[in-house]
Amino acid sequence: MFAVIRTGGKQYRVAKDDVLEVERNGGEAGDKIDLEVLMLGGEGGTLKVGAPLVDGAKVKAEIVEHTRGPKITIFKKRRRQNYRRKNGHRQDLMLVKILDIAG
């Protein structure tokens, strides 16, 4: 059984015992969270599609750890104007383990 969940403005296809990296949205390591289910697939080709969410479907997950993504560099420049800006960014992420898909 699989589910398509939405978190952090992105969609992920998950199955039981998957570990994925999503944007941090609160909670501490070891906390249990529920995720929004957009689509739910089962054995035998059955598929439930939500509008926008599937009624009664839940994906339970556990926060494994908090991490940070790779550093990216933002550089802005306007030629001949002596305008240069250099900035860096690292996204806050968390590792999530899918415990159960109920639907």
Swiss-Prot record:
The gene is rplU. This protein binds to 23S rRNA in the presence of protein L20. GO terms for biological process: translation. Belongs to the bacterial ribosomal protein bL21 family. SUPFAM superfamilies: L21p-like (SSF141091). It holds the Pfam family Ribosomal_L21p. HAMAP family: Ribosomal_bL21 (MF_01363). Keywords: Ribonucleoprotein, Ribosomal protein, RNA-binding, rRNA-binding. Part of the 50S ribosomal subunit. Contacts protein L20. This is Large ribosomal subunit protein bL21. GO terms for molecular function: rRNA binding; structural constituent of ribosome. InterPro entries: bL21-like (IPR028909), bL21-like_sf (IPR036164), Ribosomal_bL21 (IPR001787). One of its GO terms (cellular component) is cytoplasm.
